[in-house]
């Protein structure tokens, strides 16, 4: 009940017990507001009703300085965050408070972060390709407009760099709105991303940052904030979708959302499930993922980085995410070790829309032929390791040579990685990607050594580099 006042009776880490009059017990997910003695405001979200007017709530910020006996006020509604055009070009925390030092948000509309997904009759399910400008993704595992894509990989194989490149490409090439949720990742990376977005420009007047909303709940924050920051970003993205826009939602990293849920679950005293995860893992994931959908008004296309603990894809966290996705981009450490970036594994990455009826016969044929050549090369690895390449048949030698060129041609200079590669980023349209790989498979560039294919845009760039070296 709004305005009801209770007393904090227990503080266990970030979990707070508060006692209210029994007939005024706050509802589940209601926000409680607690004023600390130092003048700071602390918000906690009700998670359990224990009976007798006692509720258990999880704090969204540190409980340092809190003591038993302080007042807790029921706001009568869930955490509500600002939405609308005023949020563009701003940086927020889980409560929707700006953390960029740019003053208050210019908006009058606030929405609760707990909302039901759109009704089934309002949802739209058109299968349409979403161009990213990244060759290996567009060819092998094309994104679905209004779909969900997971970028899977262990530590340090390049998930965040791909996400950053996608944000830059979308803002420049498609002039869409982006919402970025930094869930439990490094504050330094978040800071770098903000500065890069401010420097990157769509044109002389517009920065990439001006078309982006950023919401952060970083590694150093309590689990409650990391668990709810995804919902805060989702609520802001839903506003733009409901206004008829196509929105991109980036979540880095969805595994940290699961990890935060596991911490909260343990603090609330729930019995852990397999590998120590929370028993409500599937439900929590579903509540977030089902809201990421397209309606007849607009679309939300989502890209989610998924950390894979110890490179184990059978771990319950990545396995639960898999079931919600339309496309999966798998990053492989062995490819990164060869210096090929993005380190996407074209044999393990999949997309629901790699179908001749959607992408076209030519695209489908080229993608499958590329995978066939790479698979044959993989099958021959043991023979090459034991006997050497010279013992292969002429046909297999040609397959190996083309496969090694394909592997290197899948690498690409990124705009956001210019300081590492020393090369300007390249955006390759999907039509050019398909034609380039078709020409490579047809043997047009069999005479060019494989090193010329590394970190190039289209096939014409490869030919130019080769001819320049011969002068």
Curated annotation (Swiss-Prot):
Protein's UniProt name: ATP synthase subunit beta
Signal peptide feature range: none
GO MF term list: ATP binding; ATP hydrolysis activity; proton-transporting ATP synthase activity, rotational mechanism
Record's catalysed reaction(s): ATP + H2O + 4 H(+)(in) = ADP + phosphate + 5 H(+)(out)
Function: Produces ATP from ADP in the presence of a proton gradient across the membrane. The catalytic sites are hosted primarily by the beta subunits.
Binding site for ATP: 153-160
Family: Belongs to the ATPase alpha/beta chains family.
Main location: membrane
Keyword flag Ion transport: yes
Gene responsible for this protein: atpD
Keyword Methyltransferase among UniProt keywords: no
Transmembrane region(s): none
InterPro entries: AAA+_ATPase, ATP-synt_VA_C, ATP_synth_F1_bsu, ATPase_a/bsu_AS, ATPase_alpha/beta_chains, ATPase_F1/V1/A1_a/bsu_N, ATPase_F1/V1/A1_a/bsu_N_sf, ATPase_F1/V1/A1_a/bsu_nucl-bd
Domain of life, source organism: Bacteria
């Amino acid at each position: 009940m709004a305005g009801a006042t209770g007393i904090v009776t227990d503080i266990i880490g970030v979990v707070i017990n508060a006692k209210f009059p029994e007939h005024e017990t706050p509802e589940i997910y209601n926000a409680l507001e607690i004023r600390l003695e130092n003048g700071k405001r602390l918000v906690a979200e009700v998670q359990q009703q224990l009976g007798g007017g006692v509720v258990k709530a999880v704090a969204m910020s540190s409980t340092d300085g809190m003591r038993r006996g302080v007042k807790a006020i029921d706001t009568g509604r869930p955490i509500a965050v600002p939405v609308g055009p005023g949020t563009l070009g701003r940086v927020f925390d889980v409560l929707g408070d700006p953390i960029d030092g740019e003053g208050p948000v210019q908006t009058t509309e606030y929405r609760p972060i707990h909302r039901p997904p759109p009704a089934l009759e309002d949802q739209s399910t058109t299968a349409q390709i979403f161009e990213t400008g990244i060759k290996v993704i567009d060819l092998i595992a094309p994104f679905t407009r209004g779909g969900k894509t997971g970028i899977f990989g262990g530590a340090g194989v390049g998930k965040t760099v791909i996400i950053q490149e996608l944000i830059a490409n979308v803002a420049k090439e498609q002039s869409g709105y982006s919402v970025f949720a930094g869930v439990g990742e490094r504050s330094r990376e978040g800071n770098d991303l903000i500065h890069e977005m401010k420097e990157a420009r769509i044109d002389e007047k517009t920065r990439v940052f001006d078309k982006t909303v950023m919401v952060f709940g970083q590694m150093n924050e309590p689990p409650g904030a990391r668990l709810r920051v995804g919902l805060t970003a989702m609520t802001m993205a839903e506003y733009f979708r409901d206004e008829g826009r196509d929105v991109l939602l980036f979540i880095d990293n969805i595994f940290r959302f699961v990890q935060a849920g596991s911490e909260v679950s343990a603090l609330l005293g729930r019995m852990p499930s397999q590998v120590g995860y929370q028993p409500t893992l599937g439900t929590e994931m579903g509540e977030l993922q089902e809201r990421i959908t397209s309606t007849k008004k607009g679309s939300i296309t989502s890209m989610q980085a998924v950390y894979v603990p110890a490179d184990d894809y059978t771990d319950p966290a990545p396995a639960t995410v898999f079931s919600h996705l339309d496309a999966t981009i798998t990053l492989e450490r062995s490819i990164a070790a060869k210096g090929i970036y993005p380190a996407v594994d074209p044999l393990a990455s999949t997309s629901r829309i790699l179908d001749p009826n959607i992408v076209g016969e030519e695209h489908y044929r080229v993608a499958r032929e590329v995978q066939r050549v790479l698979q044959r090369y993989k099958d021959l690895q043991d023979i090459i390791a034991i006997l050497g390449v010279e013992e292969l048949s002429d046909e297999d030698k040609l397959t190996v040579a083309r496969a090694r060129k394909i592997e290197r041609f899948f690498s690409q200079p990124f705009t956001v990685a210019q300081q590492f590669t020393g090369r300007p980023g390249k955006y390759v349209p999907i039509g050019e990607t398909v034609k380039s790989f078709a020409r490579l498979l047809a043997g047009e560039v069999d005479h060019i050594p494989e090193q010329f294919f590394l970190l190039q845009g289209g096939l014409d760039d490869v030919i130019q580099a080769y001819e320049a070296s011969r002068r």
